[in-house]
Structures are given as structure tokens and as C-alpha cells.
Amino acid sequence: DYIKGTGTKLPKHTPISCNELLKAMLVHSDNYAAHALSRSAGMSRTQFIQKMNQKAKQLGMNSTRFHDSSGLSSANISSAMDLVKLAKYSMNKPQIQMLSNTKATYVRAGRQNVFMQNTNRLVREEMFDAAINKTGYIRESGYNLVFVNKHQCNKATIGVISLNNASSGARSNFTRHKLEQYGCDVLAHEDYGLEEDEES
């Protein structure tokens, strides 16, 4: 299917396993992979989105409403506190945790191995050790990032939710500044500046 406002590295009309789609989703923020994964669930689009909203309610995400499975609709809404609840839930899911923190990987698509890098520069360049993280972007909300540090900072678990940034570099720098401010150790000390992440 064509999804307006995004592209994909994945080849068309190619069999891809659900595990490989999840990998593309969580490492590279591939919206086509998210859409294809929902299509493979054995239910209609409407039923799948209903399941997403039911899960959000189950997690206490009372300000969250999903309108599509790819994450690109401006009708999808949430709140910072709901993202905290989702991050806590995701931290108890080893596969989600592992994939979201993978620097780069190959996604098996038919006979091809498609190289994909993490869309989060803090993970890709190993600035911090993440427990869970996820980037996001649409025009209406700007560049966003949820990042929870793996190791305690001054005896506390520190997470940063960076919303409505003008660029991917800005969200990375804001998050890095907050993690440093609360005593989280930087794993690399080069001056990374404002260079851009891959979009999403």
C-alpha cells in the first residue's frame, strides 16, 4: 500500500516475516513495516485500531487515541504522561527493549538483507546506554523522542520526553542536555553538534 508522507527501504511485493517487520519498525521507525504488521494480524484495519485503543486504555493511557497503525495520522493524539506509561510497559518487553536499542541491523526481505540504522542518534553513536527509546516525526508534532537511561543517574531512573522539536538534531541535543543535567554518564565525549538524524 502507498502511505502518504513517508518512504521505506523495504522492497515491494516481497514476503517479510513479522519478526523482521518489527525489527524495521523499532530500529528504523519504518511506517510501512508498522502498516504491514497490522495487515498481517488477521483482522480488518478498523478492528486492529480498536485493539490498539483498547490496549492504551488497559495501560491507563486515557489521553491517547489511535486513528491509524502507521503512526503518521495527525489524528493520533497522546500526552507526555501517557508516553511515560507506554515506556514503562515497553521496558518489560525484552524484544521491544532490545530492538529499540539496536544501533543498526539487517532486515531479511525475501532474498534481500536490507541495512537499517537506528533513527536515534544517541543510540546510533552510543552516547548513552538506553533502557528504552523511540523516535517519532510528523509535520504537525515535530521531531519527538522518548528516552529512558538504562543505568541510574544519581540513584534515580531518568527518562526524557522531548516533543515538538524543529529538527532531529534538536531533539537529540535537548535529550542529551537533560540526561547530563541529571547526572547520567555520557559514553562518548566527541562534539556531535546539530547534525541530523534520519527522519522519524
What kind of feature is each model-predicted range?
Residues 43-200:
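Penicillin-recognizing serine hydrolase domain
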Residues 2-38, 114-132:
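Conserved catalytic neighborhood of penicillin-recognizing serine enzymes
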